[in-house]
A protein has these predicted regions:
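Non-transmembrane, interaction-prone alpha-helical and coil segments associated with secretion
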Residues: 1-638, 816, 820-844
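Small-residue-rich, membrane-active alpha-helical segments
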Residues: 419-490, 494, 639-843
Length: 844
């Protein structure tokens, strides 16, 4: 009986579906044609070989589907166990909060979650390419030197199988190959399906807008001559493409890119396209003939920067790996199931609540269980959309990009002094170290070393941090540090380069990165120092924290037997025994442990380090963003209003969700006081220091001790909490920029438009009504307030006195009297004098 008859009988007997039969018929015909036309086999032999290959491929597909089904089922059982064992702050079973804990950090469980796993996977990838990151990291303003660009081109040639003879380019290419292969294996380990391909090289970044500008045929005609068809495999049959099938395949690729995946959307389903475990096959599909072909395509339809392409690949893969690890091979299906389970349990609890048989402790007395659960479900759905990336996409692209660019420019004009506020990180790092039973000085001492290394050519400590699995945020992104103050995810690259220039130039980027690396290495160094001790002999606070993250006596006994890493092995400038670390990834490399144990212990330890680092250097979180902004997207009126209101307010919100939350979780009033009182006092003192430094940088003398009253210390407390601009209202009805409380609360974007309208239409209105205008003064103030880089803390005063004051003298006829009035106001309000008075070319 022929194989076709077997397929027909299979359908009749109900063993396979019509859809499965159709796929097998198509594969059988394609294989038969290939062996007849390309291999010259006889009709009988071609049918036999095609039948066998179709059968084998069908069996492989069935095995893969079975693996996927088992992994998906196991993941659902795992999450169901989390639902049953999780306890909220009141010690109650709580399905909704249990599932939310898998999306973002939860202070009551410390479960590995998508947000933290993304960071962990990025760190693992960066670890394998420390030297590449060191050589190719962006300079100030997202700039790349001519040498970097030349070396990147040589590296691309090596990746595409060309021999350049450049040893360094070969080493960089090998580092990227190792990193990309690591990501592929991690993706597959958690249920993905990415086949290995020799000389794969690099993924492609497709700019949807650029691809849409040409027709499908024009795009295919452009890319087809650049592709190495022999290296491209038809995923369905496993055979090389012919002239017909390659155009059909490229047609699908075009539709996928131009519609952002919507071409495969089926109405009535919860998602579109392939399940995540299959989706990553696409970026390996296109195989270019040469490095020149790849670079020409990227220049025309993507990104011509290979380094950016690599970093975006790492970020995207890390996100997808995290989704697979936490939610299984089909996250959409898992999410739908989980929400269904939460709703089911909510209905049961709500019915019991109505009968008086169920009562939950809650802050809002008259809120029933169904209302509470629905609120959390809404939050969860938004978190899931955030992790998938759908919340980052502007609804109206032009509107969204315009306002994103404006926020970047405002950042470059207004955050030049934020580095001064970042000195409070030393305080947060100290109290986090103490809470975790670590030496309180160690992280801050390391941070100073990293800061000192920043002005040296040798970056040995930085490379060591990256090799230890700590993320190289400062080295791999442009304007990445602004996440501490903005909710910005994407913006036009030119605007990000401007803000990056200021953020790096001010030192904020380096201070933030140094603090994170320093704390992470402090933890690993302490664990190395303590590795000779059994669990019961560890510091009580360290024991307590490790147990919270799922590391007890049994786990510690395995972890502490891991071979310690001495950084002198890789860095000649580090003395032997000077930097010794217990690195989580070295646990993963142990041959004496099974896969599950290695993965479990490595994840738990990295989750501990990564999460506590975000306490040591408070950084914005997905939970914080979603709690405040909800489902608001860029490119909508609602989204842009919310982004404006929240601009620069991320840091205090983060403090509230980390340290303040942790303080209130401590047992009893004594426990709460032990955490919160030192936190507030230390934060206030650091806030006062930051405030006085900024006063001196603005040309003012420090505040006289006799003027340091209640208002002063309240202002210092507000400064320490990252809301310095609101502290101004303790002394005046305007902030330091002349804005009202309402304008400050509305955010910088609203203030910008308000000032722009006042400068233009406001002055025209005054002129037409015969009122006196202050157009010159307002224009000078507008230029000073909104010029990128004008408020860098170490150049601001020179710019103000020599350039801005001179400009205002020309534009404002009342400059002298206005200046005298401002000096008198300052003296009356705070008792301060200027050491470099406004309007003077030289200091007093």
């Amino acid at each position: 009986m022929s194989y076709k008859n077997c397929i027909i009988n299979g359908v009749k007997e109900g063993k396979i579906t019509d859809e499965q039969a159709k796929k097998q018929f198509e594969m059988l015909d394609e294989l038969k044609t290939y062996y007849l036309e390309k291999k010259g086999l006889s009709q009988t032999e071609a049918e036999r070989v095609a039948a066998k290959q179709t059968y084998d491929q069908t069996a492989i597909d069935a095995a893969e589907k079975l693996r996927y089904t088992i992994l998906q089922k196991n993941k659902i059982n795992e999450i169901l166990n989390v639902f049953k064992t999780y306890r909220n702050i009141n010690g109650e079973v709580d399905y909704a909060n249990a599932y939310r804990a898998l999306m973002a950090h939860d202070n009551f469980s410390n479960l590995p979650n998508i947000e933290r796993i993304v960071d962990i996977e990025r760190g693992k990838a960066h670890r394998l390419m420390a030297n590449l990151l060191d050589q190719m990291k962006y300079k100030m303003g997202g700039r790349q030197t001519k040498l970097q660009k030349a070396n990147l081109k040589l590296m691309v040639r090596e990746l595409m199988g060309e021999t350049t003879g450049n040893k360094n380019a070969k080493q960089l290419a090998d580092a990227w190959k190792k990193t990309a292969e690591h990501l592929r294996k991690r993706f597959n380990y958690f249920g993905g399906k990415i086949l290995s391909r020799e000389n794969w090289g690099l993924p492609q970044i497709h700019d949807t807008l650029l691809v849409r500008q040409v027709s499908k045929e024009d795009w295919i005609d452009y890319i087809l001559p650049k592709l190495d068809i022999d290296k491209m495999i038809n995923e369905r049959s496993g055979l090389p493409f012919n002239d017909k099938t390659i155009r059909e395949a490229l047609s699908e690729v075009y539709e996928n890119i131009s519609t952002e995946g919507m071409a495969t959307f089926k109405p009535g389903t919860n998602s579109f396209g392939r399940a995540l475990h299959n989706r990553r096959v696409d970026h390996r599909f296109l195989a270019f003939k040469s490095a020149d072909d790849w670079m020409e395509y990227q220049t025309r339809f993507g990104s011509p920067d290979p380094f950016k392409t690599m970093m975006e690949h790492i970020n995207g893969m890390s996100r997808d790996i995290a989704m697979l690890k936490i939610l299984g091979p089909n996250p959409d299906a898992t999410h739908t199931w989980a929400i269904g389970m939460i709703k089911k349990q909510t209905k049961i609890d709500a019915a019991l609540e109505a009968q008086g048989k169920f009562k939950r402790k809650k802050l809002v007395k008259y809120r029933n269980e169904e209302d509470r659960s629905n609120s959390i479900i809404e939050n969860i759905n938004n978190l899931y959309a955030f992790h998938k990336g759908t919340l980052h996409k502007p609804i109206d692209g032009f509107f969204g990009r315009t306002f994103a660019a404006l926020r970047q420019l405002l950042t470059s004009a207004q955050l030049g002094g934020a580095a001064v506020m970042a000195i409070t990180d030393f305080h947060w790092s100290r109290i986090t170290s103490k809470f975790n039973g670590l030496p309180t000085y160690k992280a801050n001492k390391n941070a100073v070393k990293f800061l000192a290394e920043g002005i040296k050519k040798d970056k040995a400590l930085s490379r060591t941090a990256i090799r230890s699995g700590l993320i190289a945020e400062h080295w791999s992104t442009v304007a990445g540090v602004q996440a501490r103050y903005l909710n910005e995810v994407d913006a036009p690259f030119w605007s990000k380069r401007i803000s990056d220039f200021v953020l790096r130039g001010s030192g904020l980027s380096h201070i933030t990165q140094s603090g994170k690396w320093a704390y992470g290495m402090s933890v690993m160094g302490t664990l190395a120092d303590e590795s000779g001790k059994v669990f019961s002999k560890l510091d009580q606070n360290l024991q307590k924290q490790l147990q919270k993250y799922g590391i007890g006596e049994k786990e510690w006994d395995i972890i502490r037997k891991t071979k310690l890493y001495d950084a002198s092995i890789d860095e000649d400038t580090i003395a032997k025994g000077k930097v010794v670390l217990l690195r989580p990834d070295d646990i993963h490399a142990r041959a004496d442990l099974d896969d599950a144990t290695r993965e479990f212990l490595t994840t738990r330890l990295l989750n501990y380090i990564t999460n506590e680092t975000n306490f040591a250097v408070p950084t914005s979180s997905a939970k914080g963003r979603i709690t405040l902004a909800g489902s608001a997207q860029p490119g909508t009126f609602k989204g842009e209003i919310i982004n404006s209101v929240l601009m620069y307010k991320n840091f205090p919100i983060t403090l509230g969700m980390t340290h303040l939350n942790r303080g209130f979780q401590q047992v009893g009033l004594t426990g709460k006081a032990k955490y919160l009182v030192p936190m507030i006092i230390g934060g206030t003192l650091m806030g006062a220091l930051a405030y006085e430094i900024k006063q001196v940088a603005a040309g003012k003398k420090p505040t006289p001790p006799e003027k340091m009253g209640t208002k002063y210390w309240l202002n210092a407390m507000v400064y320490g909490g990252g809301l310095g601009i609101f502290g101004d209202f303790l002394f005046s009805d305007q902030n330091r920029y002349g804005g009202s409380f309402e304008k400050t609360l509305a955010g910088p974007v609203a203030s910008f438009w308000g000032d722009a309208i006042k400068l233009t239409f406001g002055n025209v209105k005054q002129l037409m009504s015969g009122e006196k205008t202050n157009a010159g003064k307002e224009l000078a103030a507008f230029i000073q307030r909104y010029t990128p880089g004008s408020n860098l803390w170490y150049t601001r005063l020179v710019v103000e006195r020599i350039i801005m004051d001179t400009l205002e003298k020309l534009l404002n006829p009342n400059f002298t009297s206005d200046t005298r009035q401002n000096i008198n106001k300052l003296r009356s309000r705070t008792g301060q004098e200027y050491w470099w008075s406004p309007g003077e070319i030289t200091p007093n």
